[in-house]
Amino acid sequence: MAKKAMIEREKKRERLVAKYAAKRAELKEIANDESRPMEERFKARLKLAKLPRNSSATRLHNRCQLTGRPHAYYRKLKVSRIALRELGSNGQIPGMVKSSW
């Protein structure tokens, strides 16, 4: 299981991304608009750079909701392969049965 600090850090990043998403999108639109004056675009880039680093969606990493594991993550269920196997074996995922052949 991942350290609690890593899990909390990731949750904090998710909150920051949600908080600054609209402002970030607005500034990016201004900065990438070729029809606007160069000075206005440059100011938008500076404002964008002053936003918190963790407010960028690029810094997010998918982690298992149960264990915090960063690898082998199923996006639909938001759990890792190991947690998925455990939940499936316990019958906690509807429609999922253990396969044998």
From Swiss-Prot:
One of its GO terms (biological process) is translation. Coiled coil: none annotated. One of its GO terms (cellular component) is small ribosomal subunit. InterPro entries: Ribosomal_uS14 (IPR001209), Ribosomal_uS14_bac/plastid (IPR023036), Ribosomal_uS14_CS (IPR018271). Keywords: Ribonucleoprotein, Ribosomal protein, RNA-binding, rRNA-binding. Transmembrane segments: none annotated. PROSITE patterns: RIBOSOMAL_S14 (PS00527). Belongs to the universal ribosomal protein uS14 family. Binds 16S rRNA, required for the assembly of 30S particles and may also be responsible for determining the conformation of the 16S rRNA at the A site. Part of the 30S ribosomal subunit. Contacts proteins S3 and S10. This is Small ribosomal subunit protein uS14.
